[in-house]
């Protein structure tokens, strides 16, 4: 048993709410819950299904989605203990400081995952299966393998990050249509430029940890080209979402043009780290505005 584990065994019983939120990566939980809610809300609105008469579905979908995302974050913290201490942004995670032992973190992850999955299956079996697939993709395919072995790790990890809006939709309306497909693609295409911005800022840390992020393996200029490519793909998607009305299409297009302009500016800007910070901030605002707009605009359809 290493020193972290020894310390963890002594202090695990005293971990705080803040330690718990850091263990489950509460920021990621919140953002994924928003996208799951959006998928669910649009399924209600666009299919003429009563929101008020399905309070149980709403509860199980939102809480279940939050729990499986939280479980995935906790699993990831357990898996990454060997590299988290090397990186500045992760060295103070509770699994590194000893506030939560590896065994305790694993137990928390298992409980959250099982309870969350059961709740999703209480909506529709399709939502439950999607939840299981999402956790498997993130924990096994991404965290255990792709993150450490493949330069395409970010793209592979984007599959799991695009699952929550599908869960929300299929919990209400378990059939495919253009809207849930586009929600998946929006989230899938949004993640590479978002996480590549982080990778550029933390390039040296990822290199020290031996993580083959795109900026580490191919360089920053190559990463900028990839980010530009993914933003271009995003600019196409609104034109397949006229079910949400012309106002949404215009708003999404304007947001995409802004992000595209910022992406192009990156090829001329000498300070790549500063530019990456701008890209990161824009990506967060982009997702928030876009998904809130989907909810609000759909009310008036």
Swiss-Prot record:
* Gene Ontology BP terms: heme O biosynthetic process
Gene3D superfamilies according to UniProt: UbiA prenyltransferase
* Membrane topology summary: Multi-pass membrane protein
Q: What else is known?
A: Carbon 2 of the heme B porphyrin ring is defined according to the Fischer nomenclature.
TM region positions: 20-42, 55-75, 105-125, 126-146, 150-172, 176-198, 227-247, 249-269, 280-300
Is Transmembrane helix one of the keywords UniProt gives this record? yes
Print the keywords alphabetically: Cell membrane, Heme biosynthesis, Membrane, Transferase, Transmembrane, Transmembrane helix
Pathway connected to this protein: Porphyrin-containing compound metabolism; heme O biosynthesis; heme O from protoheme: step 1/1
Record family assignment: Belongs to the UbiA prenyltransferase family. Protoheme IX farnesyltransferase subfamily.
Q: What function does the entry list?
A: Converts heme B (protoheme IX) to heme O by substitution of the vinyl group on carbon 2 of heme B porphyrin ring with a hydroxyethyl farnesyl side group.
The catalytic activity of this protein is classed by the Enzyme Commission as: 2.5.1.141
Localization of this protein: Cell membrane
Q: What is its main location?
A: membrane
Q: Which GO terms describe its molecular function?
A: protoheme IX farnesyltransferase activity
Any one of the GO CC terms:
plasma membrane
Its name, as the record gives it, is Protoheme IX farnesyltransferase
What is a single Pfam family found in this protein's UniProt entry? UbiA
């Amino acid at each position: 048993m290493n020193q972290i584990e020894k310390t963890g065994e002594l202090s695990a019983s005293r971990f705080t709410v803040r330690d718990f939120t850091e263990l489950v990566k509460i920021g990621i939980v919140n953002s994924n819950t928003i996208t799951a809610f959006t998928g669910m809300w649009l399924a209600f609105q666009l299919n003429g299904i009563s929101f008020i008469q399905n309070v149980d579905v709403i509860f199980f979908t939102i809480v279940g989605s939050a729990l499986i995302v939280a479980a995935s974050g906790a699993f990831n913290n357990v898996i990454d203990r060997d590299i988290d201490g090397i990186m500045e942004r992760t060295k103070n995670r509770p699994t590194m400081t000893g506030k939560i032992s590896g065994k305790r973190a694993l137990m928390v992850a298992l409980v959250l995952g099982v309870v969350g999955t059961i709740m999703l299956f209480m909506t529709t079996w399709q939502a439950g299966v999607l939840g299981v697939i999402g956790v498997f993709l993130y924990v096994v395919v991404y965290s255990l393998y792709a993150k450490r072995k493949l330069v395409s790790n970010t793209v592979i990890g984007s599959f799991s990050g695009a699952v929550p809006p599908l869960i929300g939709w299929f919990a209400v309306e378990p059939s495919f249509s253009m809207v849930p497909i586009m929600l998946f693609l929006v989230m899938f295409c949004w993640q590479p430029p978002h996480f590549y911005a982080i990778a550029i800022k933390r390039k040296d840390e990822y290199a020290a940890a031996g993580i083959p992020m795109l900026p580490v393996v191919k360089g920053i200029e190559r990463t900028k080209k990839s980010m530009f490519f993914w933003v271009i793909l995003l600019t196409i998607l609104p034109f397949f979402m006229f079910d949400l009305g012309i106002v949404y299409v215009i708003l999404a297009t304007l947001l995409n043009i802004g992000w595209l302009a910022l992406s192009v500016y990156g090829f001329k800007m000498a300070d790549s780290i500063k530019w990456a910070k701008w890209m990161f901030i824009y990506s967060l605002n982009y997702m928030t505005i876009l998904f809130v707009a989907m909810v609000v605009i759909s009310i008036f359809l």
